[in-house]
Swiss-Prot record:
It is a peripheral membrane protein. GO terms for biological process: chaperone-mediated protein folding; protein maturation. Belongs to the TorD/DmsD family. DmsD subfamily. GO terms for cellular component: cytoplasm; plasma membrane. It comes from Escherichia coli (strain K12). This is Tat proofreading chaperone DmsD. The keyword Cytoplasm applies.
Amino acid sequence: MTHFSQQDNFSVAARVLGALFYYAPESAEAAPLVAVLTSDGWETQWPLPEASLAPLVTAFQTQCEETHAQAWQRLFVGPWALPSPPWGSVWLDRESVLFGDSTLALRQWMREKGIQFEMKQNEPEDHFGSLLLMAAWLAENGRQTECEELLAWHLFPWSTRFLDVFIEKAEHPFYRALGELARLTLAQWQSQLLIPVAVKPLFR
């Protein structure tokens, strides 16, 4: 049985998307990736048909008065309400809270699988970016079954809705394109999954 997450391009794409959603654009982790996506040529290396990526190449390079750092602050930090919060429990919990039941279920699954993953101080583990980074780490360490369980049980049940709202509310060409790239890539992965995606009610 071949897992799609065994492919080298899976972990690379998951790590790129995860870092860009999780880290500030000027950070050591994200800045080189921002530079790549705002240049020509990355689309030839991405595991999707180039024709579907052509509009994103232009969008990533589109100039905007709002800087990448300002957009990041507005979309991921605040101080105002985030237009599309990147934590799973905000979408999956009836009260739309951080550290909700879905976060606790993820923690329990991680404990059962012996997965330890460093998070920023006091941040929930179910951040969209950190889940992608965790998936990349699992794939790179030959843990394909756990990687695909993570996607099917703890990310895909809410990620489509999160990305739809993120793209709609991003209001910055780079982050709108990033949301679209993530939506296309995750849809491709979901179509290749060997286990069914958990069906969970969404509350946003």
